Amino acid sequence: MAGPNGDPHVLGGGTGDEGDEGGDTFEEEEYAAINSMLDQINSCLDHLEEKNDHLHICLKELLESNRQTRLEFQQQSKQLNTGADVQGSQPPA
């Protein structure tokens, strides 16, 4: 049986001419195990991607919330400064 790049797999250093059916079974089991591991890795990566997307959304919401809070704080600060300037320019009673 040829490998993924077309090179023949030779088990046990033989030439592959022995007609060993056990070798094909071993290779199939090996490929099945590798496929299973790749499926698990793929599932883990999908899960990580979902968590990353969720985290990204949460961080964007937090950033927007912080921007809103900062703008509100700046507006309040301006109003207080404007009020203090108006009171400071009036003569004391």
From Swiss-Prot:
Pfam families: UPF0184
Disulfide links within the chain: none
Region (Disordered): 1-26, 74-93
GO MF entries: molecular adaptor activity
GO BP annotations listed: intermediate filament bundle assembly
Coiled-coil boundaries: 59-80
A GO CC annotation given for this chain: cytoskeleton
Keyword Cytoplasm among record annotations: yes
Keyword tags: Cell junction, Coiled coil, Cytoplasm, Cytoskeleton
Biased composition annotated in UniProt, kind: Acidic residues: 17-26
Cellular location(s): Cell junction; Cytoplasm, Cytoskeleton
Family classification: Belongs to the UPF0184 (EST00098) family.
UniProt-listed PANTHER family: BUBLIN COILED-COIL PROTEIN (PTHR34344:SF1), UPF0184 PROTEIN C9ORF16 (PTHR34344)
Its biological purpose: Essential for intermediate filament organization in intestinal cells, interacts with intermediate filament and regulates intestinal lumen morphology.
The name this protein goes by in its record: Bublin coiled-coil protein
Species, as recorded: Taeniopygia guttata
